[in-house]
Amino acid sequence: MSDTADRVKKIVVEHLGVEADKVTEEASFIDDLGADSLDIVELVMAFEEEFGVEIPDDAAEKISTVSDAIKYIDENKG
């Protein structure tokens, strides 16, 4: 597992209060991890801060799974 994946999963566990073993790359933030729209906004902000990337609203709307977040961050981080 990549460093990005580990860090994304850690943020998800901290922000959503879910068990780490539930945070798989295929997990949907809403359907599998119980996030609501406010949680998603907070996760996106945490990803931006942690990785120094900007995630515009149109891109954030397409990030629905853990792997979506990892892929976006890997493709856009400095």
Swiss-Prot record:
The modification O-(pantetheine 4'-phosphoryl)serine is found at residue 37. It comes from the Bacteria. 4'-phosphopantetheine is transferred from CoA to a specific serine of apo-ACP by AcpS. This modification is essential for activity because fatty acids are bound in thioester linkage to the sulfhydryl of the prosthetic group. Keywords: Cytoplasm, Fatty acid biosynthesis, Fatty acid metabolism, Lipid biosynthesis, Lipid metabolism, Phosphopantetheine, Phosphoprotein. One of its GO terms (biological process) is lipid A biosynthetic process. It holds the Pfam family PP-binding. SMART domains: PKS_PP. SUPFAM superfamilies: ACP-like (SSF47336). Pathway: Lipid metabolism; fatty acid biosynthesis. GO terms for molecular function: acyl binding; acyl carrier activity; phosphopantetheine binding. Belongs to the acyl carrier protein (ACP) family. This is Acyl carrier protein. It comes from Novosphingobium aromaticivorans (strain ATCC 700278 / DSM 12444 / CCUG 56034 / CIP 105152 / NBRC 16084 / F199). The gene is acpP.
